[in-house]
């Protein structure tokens, strides 16, 4: 078989920041067969490994890519046994192959599950549906309508904020920004609820933000992932009020339970090395629209070349009066796939010719550039506002990488108004160098990045990490055990999820969570009573504990019921 090295050296005219000679490693699960995988995983056969592993021509030996967590120096661990890392990648490829095999069945199952969940809900559950069938009054669900709720929304039907009136009042106080930190429960609750709401369609998001939270819905975006060739990245923005806002929130959608591509991304070990930042998870960069692994040079082009192009367009757009620029774009239609045009959230097309030109010249409908442009306009319009970025699961990964790229692009004025980054059940996004880079910008003068992890949630333990492997968490970890006891630590317990000494506690804990689901309403009130969908997921947790622990139900409960750890307690 021909060499699998991919030449990512590109020559791009004009002044650019960074280099086109970056290093990368792509782990492809679809190329080789099972026998190739066995030969690579068990015996370390290089020819078989080359079918799965593609790496940059200038990056040195493949073993370097597998063993060394950071080649930039600075005190990182070096060495390690190549077979250990080969085994990790071997398991990753198997899992991704299995997910890919069940990709279509997962998608069909998702459609059926969400259809019947909404059918029962709209007709008053099972008995109500039978009654409506007999009387010819069945209400049919319509995907994309204001009454169609996602599977995640059915797991946790809570839509109201913890203390919405208190939060709205506090945001307007002059010293509110000094109160922000790990312990600000109301803001953490808003971020978690927004992360959960991001799984819904635009109409549901708009209704909840405007009618229930009494805030101002700004925009909802469906953004292009060039590798997946679909609009698979969703994000929405809100302000605490329409005029003179004090708070702007950006919420990225997370891993959808029936989306095979999302789960494959979570289990992916591919990375791309960005100058200054370090090695970053390639799948998450693709979700932000910042490249496509089928042509590695596109990462350099999106990160550096298009940044200069787009910055010039933003400067042109800055000349438009705020009253006009406040009419912004939301989701894109398929017909606009390669024009970069979009529609305003109130279905009105802008009449200003300069604004039309700006829209048509947007390089791509990518999440990073679209959100950055809108955020800069909002910050210009609301002079006193600060912004937070949030997300659950994969959305949490995008929430931390979005400001990371802002720092890379030296968006100093924007980053000065960052209030905080709150992620929930977030997977690992890069290596130690990325962690050091971001901590230097987010830890001083006060911490601005808070990573919340519930108990045995599987996703924060992905991709796999050990003393020498690539992916590392960074920032403050706010960890909650299954009793909702809070602890601030550097790394969650059982950081890699697997291991015999953790196996029995994992299943015991899953059994306890199933029992607890029947008592929550009695212990804490009707607001915490778990629906039958959530109980069924708990039952599934008896077989896959880490999956059930990833539910937003426990993250909302952790924030609202969480108690500071006062004595030495088990992580059970």
Curated annotation (Swiss-Prot):
The chain crosses the membrane at residues 110-130. SUPFAM superfamilies: alpha/beta-Hydrolases (SSF53474). It is a single-pass membrane protein. One of its GO terms (molecular function) is triacylglycerol lipase activity. Keywords: Hydrolase, Lipid degradation, Lipid droplet, Lipid metabolism, Membrane, Transmembrane, Transmembrane helix. Expressed in pollen grains and pollen tubes. The active site is at 393 (nucleophile), 457 (charge relay system), 550 (charge relay system). Residues 323-334 have a biased composition (Low complexity). GO terms for cellular component: lipid droplet; membrane. One of its GO terms (biological process) is lipid catabolic process. InterPro entries: AB_hydrolase_fold, Fungal_lipase-type, OBL-like. It is found in: Lipid droplet; Membrane. Residues 346-356 have a biased composition (Basic and acidic residues). A motif (GXSXG) lies at residues 391-395. It is an enzyme of class 3 (hydrolase). Acid lipase that can hydrolyze a range of triacylglycerols without a clear preference for acyl-chains. Can also cleave 1,2-diacylglycerol, 1,3-diacylglycerol and 1-monoacylglycerol, but not phosphatidylcholine, phosphatidylethanolamine, or sterol esters. Required for pollen tube growth. Triacylglycerol hydrolysis by OBL1 may provide acyl groups for the synthesis of membrane lipids in growing pollen tubes. Belongs to the AB hydrolase superfamily. Lipase family. This is Triacylglycerol lipase OBL1. It comes from Nicotiana tabacum (Common tobacco).
């Amino acid at each position: 078989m021909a060499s699998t090295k991919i030449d990512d050296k590109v020559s791009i005219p004009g002044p650019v920041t960074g280099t086109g000679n970056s290093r990368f490693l792509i782990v492809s699960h679809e190329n080789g067969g099972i026998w190739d995988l066995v030969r690579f995983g068990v015996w370390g056969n290089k020819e078989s490994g080359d079918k799965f592993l593609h790496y940059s021509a200038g990056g040195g030996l493949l073993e370097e890519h597998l063993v060394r967590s950071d080649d930039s120096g600075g005190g990182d661990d070096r060495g390690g046994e190549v077979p250990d890392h080969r085994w990790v990648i071997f398991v990753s490829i198997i899992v991704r192959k299995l997910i890919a095999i069940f990709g279509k069945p997962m998608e069909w199952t998702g459609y059926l599950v969400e259809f019947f969940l909404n059918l029962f809900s709209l007709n008053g559950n099972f008995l109500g549906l039978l009654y409506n069938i007999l009387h010819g009054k069945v209400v049919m669900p319509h995907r994309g309508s204001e009454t169609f709720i996602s599977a995640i929304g059915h797991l946790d039907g809570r839509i109201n904020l913890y203390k919405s009136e208190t939060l709205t009042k506090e945001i307007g106080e002059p010293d509110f920004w000094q109160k922000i930190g790990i312990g600000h429960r109301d803001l953490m609750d808003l971020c978690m609820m927004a992360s959960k709401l991001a799984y819904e369609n635009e109409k549901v998001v708009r209704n909840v933000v405007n009618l229930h939270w009494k805030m101002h819905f700004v925009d909802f975006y469906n953004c292009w992932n060039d590798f997946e060739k679909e609009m698979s990245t969703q994000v929405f923005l809100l302000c605490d009020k329409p005029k003179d806002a004090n708070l702007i929130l950006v919420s990225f959608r997370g891993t959808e339970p029936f989306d095979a591509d999302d789960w494959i991304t979570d289990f992916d070990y591919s990375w791309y090395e960005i100058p200054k930042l370090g090695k970053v998870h390639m799948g998450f960069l693709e979700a932000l629209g910042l490249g496509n692994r089928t042509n590695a040079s596109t990462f350099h082009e999106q990160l550096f070349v298009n940044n200069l192009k787009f910055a010039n367009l933003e400067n042109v757009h800055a000349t438009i009066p705020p009253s006009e620029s406040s009419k912004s774009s939301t989701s894109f239609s398929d017909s606009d796939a390669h024009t970069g045009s979009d529609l305003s959230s109130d279905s009105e097309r802008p009449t200003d010719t300069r604004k039309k030109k700006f829209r048509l010249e947007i390089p791509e409908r990518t999440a990073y550039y679209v959100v950055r442009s809108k955020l800069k306009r909002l910050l210009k319009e609301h002079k006193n506002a600060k912004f937070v970025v949030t997300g659950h699961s994969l959305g949490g990964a995008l929430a931390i990488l979005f400001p990371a790229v802002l720092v890379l692009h030296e968006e100093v004025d924007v980053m000065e108004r960052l209030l905080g980054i709150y992620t929930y059940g977030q997977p690992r996004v890069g290596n130690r160098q990325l962690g050091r880079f971001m901590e230097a910008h987010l830890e001083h003068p006060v911490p601005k990045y808070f990573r919340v992890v519930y108990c045995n949630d599987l996703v924060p333990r992905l991709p796999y990490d050990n003393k020498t492997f690539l992916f590392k968490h960074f920032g403050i970890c706010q960890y909650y055990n299954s009793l909702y006891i809070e602890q601030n630590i550097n790394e969650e317990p059982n950081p890699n999820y697997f291991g015999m000494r953790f196996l029995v506690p994992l299943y015991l804990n899953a059994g306890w969570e199933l029992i607890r689901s029947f008592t929550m309403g009695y212990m804490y009130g009707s607001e915490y009573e778990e629906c039958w969908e959530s109980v069924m997921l708990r039952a599934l947790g008896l077989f896959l504990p880490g999956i059930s622990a990833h539910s937003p139900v426990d993250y909302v409960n952790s924030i609202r019921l969480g108690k500071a750890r006062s004595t030495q307690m088990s992580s059970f």
